[in-house]
Amino acid sequence: MASTTGALILAAGKGTRMHSDKPKVLQTILGEPMLRFVMDALAPVFGDRVWTVVGHRADMIYAAFAGEDARFVVQEQQLGTGHALQMAWESLRAAGLDRVVVVNGDTPLLATETIDFFLKESAEADIAFMTLTLPDPGAYGRVVRHNGHVAAIVEAKDYDEALYGPEPSEINTGIYALRLDAVESLLPRLTNANRSGEYYITDLVGLAVAGRMNVLGIQCGEDPNLLGVNNPAELIRSEALLRTRLVIGHIEGGVLIHAPETVRISPRATIEPGAEIYGPCEIYGTSRIARGAVVHSHCWLRNAEVESGSEVKSFSHLEGATVGKGCSVGPFARLRPGAVLDEEARVGNFVEMKKARLHKGAKAGHLTYLGDADVGAGANIGAGTITCNYDGKNKHRTVIGAGAFIGSNTALVAPVTVGDGSLVGAGSVITKDVPEASLAIARGRQTNLPRKPKA
């Protein structure tokens, strides 16, 4: 793609029909904001030459894409799509663009291949836009043609058969290709003389036709992938289509997915050929499942890594965690951000880890909390062990040495260290460091007293 072509995403609207406090483009699909799907479709074609117009709750959009190389333009007042283009014009010109493709931020089904096709078909046009023919055009803008040639785009609420003739079934998808030199003279001529009182980008078409510019309406049949998402029902339908598309792609790539209709996978997740997934299961964010790893049913993963030969058993919850090779997790385990399992480590049922590391071969079989902890290779953590890491103000670390054995129902009050090869007796409350190769017992002596007989 020529370096003088860029893209503009319109994402400033409120999306009132979503009945949500957050902007429409941040509604989630497969754990990701809807806007991300549009950005991902454009990136292979335009690289970093993509701008997004934001307005309503722009702060939330900035936060959602913090740390990413996204370019934003602010539309302080949401006065329509034409006004949004005007707000972005200086940025587009400063980037040295000759052409710009304009898309709406609520089209998560948009495919890269569609954009490639559109650019080739519109190469000679001053203004081009994509159209669909629908049995029920609904609220979409109508495409008016005279003798097959585009005459105008008229918004549904403004359509007047006395002026334009019988209402057509061909609609505007909201995807445009604009030659900047041609459009620059038209932008100041946009008006808000319509029922919405907004400046429509669609009015550029009528102005261009009147100016005898080359205007093309490129027909794309009845492709539903080009339609926007306007309400919760449409969001759910789009998510279902995207879920199926992604799951099928992984299966065709060599991933074994059982009950695929119940599996949800983020577009940013990586699942290597030879991995095995059992549904229902949810894999979100930048999670990575390596070849030979198995994730069982009813698991939830976000930004987690599972290396080859590892098994995540049912009902486990992993977020921001790393599971090394040959590990076992669960069932019913929770690995929170910063949890790391080195090779052949094991975490069993009802074990929670946070900012904690189990080195090679270490294991915590059940009913344990390991927070802000480092557990040495081969250590064994007994049932009911708790690292008491919070003193009410600050978090503190617990270090358990290689080969150590922590007896059941032990409380390790951080900061504290248990040395290599040491044993802590069951039921202990450890508040002081335990030297290497030591036995530590910190509990009250058992007393047996005679029991009074019942009266």
UniProtKB/Swiss-Prot annotation:
It is found in: Cytoplasm. Catalyzes the last two sequential reactions in the de novo biosynthetic pathway for UDP-N-acetylglucosamine (UDP-GlcNAc). The C-terminal domain catalyzes the transfer of acetyl group from acetyl coenzyme A to glucosamine-1-phosphate (GlcN-1-P) to produce N-acetylglucosamine-1-phosphate (GlcNAc-1-P), which is converted into UDP-GlcNAc by the transfer of uridine 5-monophosphate (from uridine 5-triphosphate), a reaction catalyzed by the N-terminal domain. Residues 1-232 are annotated as: Pyrophosphorylase. Its EC number is 2.7.7.23, 2.3.1.157. GO terms for biological process: cell morphogenesis; cell wall organization; lipid A biosynthetic process; peptidoglycan biosynthetic process; regulation of cell shape; UDP-N-acetylglucosamine biosynthetic process. This is Bifunctional protein GlmU. The active site is at H366 (proton acceptor). CDD domains: GT2_GlmU_N_bac, LbH_GlmU_C. The gene is glmU. It catalyses: alpha-D-glucosamine 1-phosphate + acetyl-CoA = N-acetyl-alpha-D-glucosamine 1-phosphate + CoA + H(+); N-acetyl-alpha-D-glucosamine 1-phosphate + UTP + H(+) = UDP-N-acetyl-alpha-D-glucosamine + diphosphate.
